[in-house]
């Protein structure tokens, strides 16, 4: 699948077949995702793969703040990835002599790049994904056994899509999102 086609066709998938995605395929997806760029190549993204139905049910009940829409998607998903990042590594260089004003949040930027890379790779391999942001990071970290030096960035449900691929949604025109400053 061509990169431009993959970007244009990837959609959030919320309905999955009752079919487990193999650990081998998940390993392939995460191996490609490990190439996502990060601040000074700090590679802070971590992927905790959960395909145990009991743990997914716990995340559904305790980890999405009662948001029914996400609860239903989780209940239907054969797997979920807890995307986390190692805290305190991104946003600064050379013992903090050089840093961005966004040091306290650059890890989320790196996690976002890793998340998109994961979702595009999964799509290229025939696996649908949906990224959740309405989450209880503390509850999810506890359920997933995330180390204390990491923070949860997002949940990503995954599985083989059931039914027809979601139709494209409208996009803002380039004129609405692009500025050109010439002076």
Locate predicted features.
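C-terminal helix-cap and adjacent tail motif
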Residues: 3-13, 17-18, 89, 154-183
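Short alpha-helical scaffolding segments that buttress acidic/His motifs in well-ordered protein cores
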Residues: 7, 29-33, 81, 156
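A glycine-rich helix N-cap at a beta->alpha junction
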Residues: 71-77, 146-167
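Glycine/small-residue-rich phosphate/adenosyl-binding loop
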Residues: 41-111
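Small-aliphatic-rich amphipathic alpha-helix that forms the alpha element of a beta-alpha
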Residues: 29, 33, 96-143
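A short beta-loop-alpha structural element at the N-terminal edge
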Residues: 19-24
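Short secondary-structure boundary segments
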Residues: 85, 134, 160
């Amino acid at each position: 699948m061509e990169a431009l086609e993959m970007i244009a066709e990837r959609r959030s998938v919320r309905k999955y077949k009752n079919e487990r995605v193999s650990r081998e395929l998940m390993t392939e997806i995460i191996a490609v995702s490990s190439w996502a760029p990060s601040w000074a190549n700090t590679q802070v993204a971590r992927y905790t793969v959960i395909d145990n139905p009991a743990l997914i049910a716990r995340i559904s009940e305790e980890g999405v703040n009662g948001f029914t829409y996400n609860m239903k998607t989780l209940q239907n998903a054969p797997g979920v990835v807890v995307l986390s990042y190692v805290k305190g590594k991104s946003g600064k260089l050379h013992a903090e002599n050089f840093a961005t004003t966004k040091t306290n949040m650059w890890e989320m930027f790196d996690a976002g790049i890793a998340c998109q890379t994961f979702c595009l790779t999964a799509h290229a391999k025939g696996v649908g994904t949906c990224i959740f942001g309405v989450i209880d990071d503390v509850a999810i970290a506890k359920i997933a056994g995330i180390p204390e030096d990491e923070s949860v960035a997002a949940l990503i449900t995954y599985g083989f899509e059931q039914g027809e691929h979601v139709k494209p949604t409208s996009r803002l025109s380039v004129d609405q999102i692009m500025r050109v400053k010439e002076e």
